[in-house]
């Protein structure tokens, strides 16, 4: 795994390329993220770094969390994220990781929490076809058959049904970094990313790179 960065989704806009084509982009506030812990094989059994993101008050954190951050000299942060690495020698406590970690044209994977839609029905949640809309129809948005009868006498686990939609972790892979504003720690990512404006995002270099 390679080092990534935490950020906040600010919203969407569009930019134009050299040919005048409009490109929809998501504006992401990426970092800065201080290194709050360095794990080694001798002390932890594996090598990794931990970074923090998002300022908060001391009152919002527990004493163990405050003590943990004090070791790195970091100010109180709201979020922590760990990245496993083969070599951590180039990192040190308190080091800041910012948007210049990425470059224009680079492919990235972005993880976040999708927008919660509440309790949703079959059509909205699973794209089921609706029933006939004629006057005599008694099945407009009902699911249809959910299984057999006496045998097995139950609905199998995993059956697609109405229920909570969204508000789950989603990862969108191989998105392109269109622009990098290192001064303001802002990334412009081609396309959409999970969540609504203000959502926390985890941005990492793409792990699967290829045409297919």
UniProtKB/Swiss-Prot annotation:
The Gene Ontology biological process terms listed for this entry are: translation
> Which intervals of the chain are annotated as region Disordered?
129-156
Compositional bias of kind Low complexity: 142-153
Query: Which cellular component terms (GO) are annotated to the entry?
Result: cytosolic large ribosomal subunit
What does the record give under GO molecular function?
Answer: rRNA binding; structural constituent of ribosome
Please give the Gene3D superfamilies that the UniProt record associates with this protein: 3.30.160.810, Translation factors
Q: Check the record and name the Pfam families matching this protein.
A: Ribosomal_L3 (PF00297)
Spell out the InterPro entries in the cross-references.
Ribosomal_uL3 (IPR000597), Ribosomal_uL3_bac/org-type (IPR019927), Ribosomal_uL3_CS (IPR019926), Transl_B-barrel_sf (IPR009000)
Q: Which UniProt keywords apply?
A: Ribonucleoprotein, Ribosomal protein, RNA-binding, rRNA-binding
Functional description taken from the UniProt entry: One of the primary rRNA binding proteins, it binds directly near the 3'-end of the 23S rRNA, where it nucleates assembly of the 50S subunit.
In the record, the note on similarity to other proteins reads:
Belongs to the universal ribosomal protein uL3 family.
Q: Which NCBIfam families match?
A: L3_bact
UniProt subunit comment = Part of the 50S ribosomal subunit. Forms a cluster with proteins L14 and L19.
* Protein name, per record: Large ribosomal subunit protein uL3
């Amino acid at each position: 795994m390679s080092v990534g960065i935490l950020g906040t989704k600010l919203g969407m806009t569009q930019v134009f390329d050299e040919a005048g084509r409009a490109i929809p982009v998501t504006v992401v506030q990426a970092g800065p993220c201080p290194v709050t812990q360095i794990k080694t094989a001798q002390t932890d059994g594996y090598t990794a770094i931990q970074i923090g993101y998002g300022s908060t008050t001391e009152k919002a954190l527990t004493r163990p969390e405050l003590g943990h951050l004090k070791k790195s000299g970091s100010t109180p942060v709201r979020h922590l994220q760990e990245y496993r690495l083969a070599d951590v020698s180039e990192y040190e406590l308190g080091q800041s990781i910012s948007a210049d970690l990425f470059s224009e044209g680079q492919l990235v994977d972005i993880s976040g929490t999708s927008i919660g839609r509440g309790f949703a029905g079959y059509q909205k949640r699973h794209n089921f076809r609706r029933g006939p809309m004629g006057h005599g129809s008694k099945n407009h948005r009902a699911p249809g058959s959910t299984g057999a009868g006496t045998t097995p006498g139950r609905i199998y686990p995993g059956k697609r049904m109405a229920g909570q939609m969204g508000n789950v972790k989603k990862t969108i892979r191989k998105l392109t970094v269109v622009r990098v504003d290192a001064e303001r720690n802002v990334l412009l990512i081609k396309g959409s990313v999970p969540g609504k404006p203000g959502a926390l995002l985890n941005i990492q270099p793409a792990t699967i790179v290829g045409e297919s």
